Amino acid sequence: MEGNAPSRGHPLEGYTTLKQFKGAKSNAIYELDGRPPFLQAFPLGFQQLLAMFVGNIVPMILVAGEARLDSYYSTLLIQCSVLGAGVATLLQAFPIRLGRIRIGSGLPIMMGLTYTFLPICLAVATNEALGLPVLFGAQLVAALSSVLVAFVLPYIRKFFPPIVTGTIIVSIGISCFSIAAYNLAGGQGDPTMGQLHNWLIGGLVIVVIVACSAFGKGMVSAAAVLIGIVAGYVVAAVGGYVDFSNIASAKWFDIPRPLAFGDGGPALVFKPEFILVFILLYFINAVEMVGDMTVSATGGLGRQPKDEELSGGILGNAFACMFASVFNCFATGSYSQCSGIVAMTKVCSRWVMGTGALTLIAAAFCPKLAGL
């Protein structure tokens, strides 16, 4: 609106008072193209990171365990999962333009390893006659199908009216309940799974999040999830429920090695039957992404996502999955819980997501940081 937005001249140009300018700066986290100060953007991006980090590395932990990989390759898989998620998120936050083609949605969505592919990943990786090279090869070639979906999506969007996308969103929300309850009880690999202290600490996190969201103002409300997680982490650490040994033994710097699997043979193996399976899974993943992008747009921005944003999001993920295949990472997809945070807090700045993505990438090169 006239008088509310600055021009490209002096920073104060377009604002009546310094107070009005500062107020606009403070509201930058609630604008898609808002550029909040780093000290404001970082904790909000870190909040998104915390909401997806465990879910992002669990598929790699499961596959590494089932495939009986040694500690080096297990750590490498986790590193690559963090790198893949960071690159995919960064591409969504800051799309690349190639003429009229847009690679990335430009919407506030957080990317990570998708569980849609987990059953086939476990089956292929644990089969001695197949292994990870077959998995990454099929994943790489099948990602081309997402390119096709991205280009035809504007023409088939009429088959996804609000009633359909609304149903998808509800289904995504319901599916998160079982995952949330499982993690609340202790999560994967916790020997104290289901014990009372897990429920009490989890309950504390929920209470803090709800209280900050309902009664907090400004950053307290916007960072409600981060505050809740930190509160739970501190209580767990004081109670002796946090193991810091993995942090002490982790390296400060390590470069994720591409095409690391193959045992002297090809690191990528292409089998048509598995490529076809992955093509189907990529379509399912695209539908889920449409739902998550709709949640972020409607909940955070108060509007429906544009055709360009949806197709750009699918296309961006296609290229992210190709990158992931080369860097020993499983296919990526949008994380519903992170879109839910956008809808709850209204923090929809792409720069906030960008700081979260850059933190993920930094963690991929610093195992000690990832161990936190």
Locations of regions flagged by a protein language model:
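N-terminal signal-anchor module of multipass membrane proteins
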Residues: 2-109, 116-124
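Flexible hinge motifs at transmembrane-helix junctions and intramembrane kinks/re-entrant loops
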Residues: 2-15, 66, 71-78, 193, ...
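Helix-boundary and loop/linker segments of multi-pass membrane transporters
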Residues: 30-37, 262-273, 306-307
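Membrane-embedded helical hairpins/re-entrant loop segments and their flanking transmembrane helices
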Residues: 38, 64-83, 87-104, 277-350
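Alpha-helical transmembrane segments of multi-pass membrane proteins, especially transporters
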Residues: 44-48, 73-85, 104-115, 119, ...
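Generic transmembrane alpha-helix signature in multi-pass membrane proteins
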Residues: 60-66, 118-126, 154, 183-185, ...
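Membrane-helix interface "capping/anchor" motifs
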Residues: 94-107, 154-159, 213-224, 345-350
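Membrane-embedded alpha-helical modules
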Residues: 124-243, 355-372
